[in-house]
């Protein structure tokens, strides 16, 4: 089947498995000018960097623990290294910038290379798939911007929760060898601050709201105008589980509360982990898209040159 037909169908319906298959066959169809993984990395598009940084942030969050009493001995909680989350956001932002720059370069090559080869007067009609490719590049840039904005916002939220979890041990202590004291009111105030300052993100103009709602699930809500808001339900459950300041619980009751409270923290982690996995999948789709686009540009340019030689 003609590569252009296959590609047009795959791009129109966003059939990423089909694009992946096309990317694998591109060397046979488009000569030696298709973009390789090494080319992507040379252009600064190395998905491993942001994904490793995000993985480190998830690991850091997972390592957080509340103070506890184990075998009769009080054990301090573990605080987070918050710079890990900053590093992840910087990596996501830098990777998105490199992806966008690469698409803009391909767009220039597509419009300049194929049309300029045909001459200013346009001796031939543009390939029917040309406008489709331009549209796909535009959609690709929109998706990059959206994912970068959302992942950055979720990472900031993740960091805020990690900060609260780190401060918990300042308000939890051993009353004696059988009881724990918890200043729940102060912890409530910390959690409420996070709820009151949850980051909001804006999808790019023209984004498919229904598609993004399906993509992101119930960890966030998306308004009809494309405003993305983090679902605070898990934080609210954590806040509402807390007792007043100065509460004393025996070890069994404290541990039961700790288990439920930490369970909500784990649920937040799962939400972010799921988004990071989707972000990784999006990066894989991007790599395959670029390989297909670069091969198509090579083919279209060769076609234009061949026409002029007739």
Curated annotation (Swiss-Prot):
**Which spans of this chain does the record mark as coiled coil?**
127-171, 250-299
Which Pfam families does this UniProt record tie to the protein?
T3SS_TC
UniProt remark on domains: The N-terminal domain is an intra-molecular chaperone that prevents premature oligomerization of the residues on the coiled-coil region that are involved in interactions with the needle and/or itself. The residues in the C-terminal domain probably form oligomeric structures at the tip of the needle that are responsible for the regulation of secretion of other effectors.
InterPro entries attached to this UniProt entry: BipD-like_sf, IpaD/BipD/SipD
Transit peptide in keyword set: no
Which NCBIfam families does the entry mention? SipD_IpaD_SspD
Q: Which family does it belong to?
A: Belongs to the invasin protein D family.
Taxonomic source organism: Burkholderia pseudomallei (strain 1106a)
Q: Which GO terms describe its cellular component?
A: extracellular region
Functional description taken from the UniProt entry: Required for invasion of epithelial cells, as well as for survival within host cells, escape from endocytic vesicles and subsequent actin-tail formation. Probably regulates the secretion of effectors BipB and BipC and their final integration into the target cell membrane.
The entry's localization annotation reads: Secreted
- Please provide the record's keywords in A-Z order: Coiled coil, Secreted, Virulence
Q: What is the lineage of its organism?
A: Bacteria, Pseudomonadati, Pseudomonadota, Betaproteobacteria, Burkholderiales
Q: What is this protein called?
A: Translocator protein BipD
Q: Which gene encodes it?
A: bipD
The primary location reported for this protein is: secreted
